[in-house]
Amino acid sequence: MSDLEKKYSKLIEGIITHLGDRKSLSFSELSNLLPDDILEPEILDCICSVLEDRGIRLVNKISELDLVVSEDGNDEEEEVEIESDRNFMILDDGFQSDEEDIDIDVKLDDCDEEDISVKDDLGSGYIKGNVLKDSHSEDPIKLYLKEIGKEFLLTGNQEVELAKQMDSGESIIENILKNEGLVIENYYNLVNTIYSRMEREEFFKREKDKDKESSPDYYNKKKRIASFYKIPLKPIQDRLISYVDNKHRVYDLGGDIFEKNLKKERLALKELLRDIPLYQEELRIFSDDYIDSANKIKDLQRQQRIILSRLKIEKIRDLRVLGRDLTIAEKKIEIEKSLKLKEDAIKEQITEAQLAQKELERIEMYYEYPTDKIISMSEEIAKGKQMMQHAKDQLIKANLRLVVSIAKKYANRGLHFFDLVQEGNIGLIKAVEKFEYKRGFKFSTYATWWIRQAITRSISDQARTIRVPVHMIEQINRLNRETRYLIQVLGKDPTDEELSDRLGWELKKVKTVKSVSREPVSLETPIGEEEDSVLSDFIEDKAIKNPANHTSFVVLQDQIRAILGTLPEREQEVVKMRFGLEDGYSLTLEEVGLHFNVTRERIRQIESKALRRLKNPKKTQKLKDYLEDLN
């Protein structure tokens, strides 16, 4: 008997006692019976061997591949076919991959419910009391793998059921928003975003305080909304704008927003808006806004109840009576004595309650429903969101092991394994949100592409100190592969010319790719034999502006502004936006066209006309002196 057999003999005897007359054991059940700190393959193999020697048949084979995350970073991906029980607690590599064709097929053996046991069913006092104690491992990866191993795998039918549940939740939300006309104001805001010219000066003033990379965000948002909603909303945009403007005008004048003409127009718009698609992003934003408004109503009503209780009145309209009584000296003294509050404190409470009431009326005007109805509909929307979220969570948790199996293929490529897993999980979440079960594909097949995309994208974005684009990464990998091949063939490092011939690239391209592939060097790298200096001591600090150049640049800006001032206002705006003269960000023809609500061709014509005017020798002569400095 080996040392391991002696050490775990009591554990093995406890397992055999638990089985009784049974002669078979699934690995899912064995995993439940074993203590959490047993993860080493040698111990598991020893236990399995002893059980097999005792005549107990094991359903599946445990291999070291299932227990230890592979550190092998090979580019070649092996095909692995896994059969696992639904409750299989050990991490399985259920990923079968090929560069051209990817197919995931996780087969689920039928599990007998009687074969699934938990630790509470064990009969051995030793196993209960000692062996099955929780082991608080300090390794987060082991803990994570252990936790995701507890999640059930899903059959194809279960995946479809969860996808249907997500659709049902989304339908509940969309039906409430559309059928009740809650999105009229939201569609009005979309129309304004699409067709109105933005406050450009205010926008650039706001963006100057931020990172310049955030400047295109507004245009990207406007472009997305325009592509989705511009054509569907165009036939009704005038009626929509007219109705909402009239409603706000009536409300501001203290009129009734539920009067006959407005109500009739609202019903007509509600019917027209039902046929307009509501995309997932807007569905999420609109429903969140509605739930936030309902929560705000609850907070305001709670605030009012507290104030009314403090002032010992029952209804909001009694606040005016209380306010008038405070102007009468005799009643004021009586009220202060009754409420045990000073006049200023009472007036402050009245003002707060009235402001809360005004905000409640504004929300009622916005959604055109009383507050009680808004709250009840928000609860239905919340149920739909909860239904969607529950189905998403189930689908995500059941496929976390798929993410790990794919992430293992990308180990040792510049990112920690756990980071790869988390990036893959982000891809999995996107796959769940975009999964269309009606197309007939298994979810694992669909999700694989999203997971791999997320992982490879994160490697290209984060693995290097300086980000290298994905297409350049592919060229670097190809260059390295051919370099290794030529070293084997030639017995020496290949020259750039030999690599150029082998790859069919121009010599310049080979040199460019090699320069990009270089790793950055630390500024703290010691320099010299005595290493008394560092690399940063020999690098010019270009952050410090040259006073002469800075002054020249400021004067140049003034000259450009003066010359642009001779152009018509619209041509000035186009030139500034096209060449980034305001914020340093040059806009495309399409982006400028979105701003002015004209075609890109019209913007090109305006730009050409403006540049022809600027080529006037009297204007260009002032700028020629700066060309030499710029060059």
UniProtKB/Swiss-Prot annotation:
Q: What does this protein do?
A: Sigma factors are initiation factors that promote the attachment of RNA polymerase to specific initiation sites and are then released. This sigma factor is the primary sigma factor during exponential growth.
Predominantly, its location class is cytoplasm
Alphabetically sorted, this entry's keywords are: Cytoplasm, DNA-binding, Sigma factor, Transcription, Transcription regulation
Q: Source species, please?
A: Borreliella burgdorferi (strain ATCC 35210 / DSM 4680 / CIP 102532 / B31)
Q: Name one Pfam family in it.
A: Sigma70_r4
Question: Which regions of the protein are recorded as binding DNA?
Answer: 589-608
**Which HAMAP family does the annotation name?**
Sigma70_RpoD_SigA
The family assignment reads:
Belongs to the sigma-70 factor family. RpoD/SigA subfamily.
Annotated region (Sigma-70 factor domain-3), positions in chain: 474-550
Intervals of motif Interaction with polymerase core subunit RpoC: 419-422
Subcellular location per the Swiss-Prot or TrEMBL entry: Cytoplasm
Residue ranges for the region (Sigma-70 factor domain-4) are 563-616
Q: What is this protein called?
A: RNA polymerase sigma factor RpoD
Assembly mode: Interacts transiently with the RNA polymerase catalytic core.
Sequence segments annotated as region (Sigma-70 factor domain-2): 395-465
Q: What is one GO biological process annotated to this record? A: DNA-templated transcription initiation
GO molecular function (one): sigma factor activity
Q: What's a single GO CC term here?
A: cytoplasm
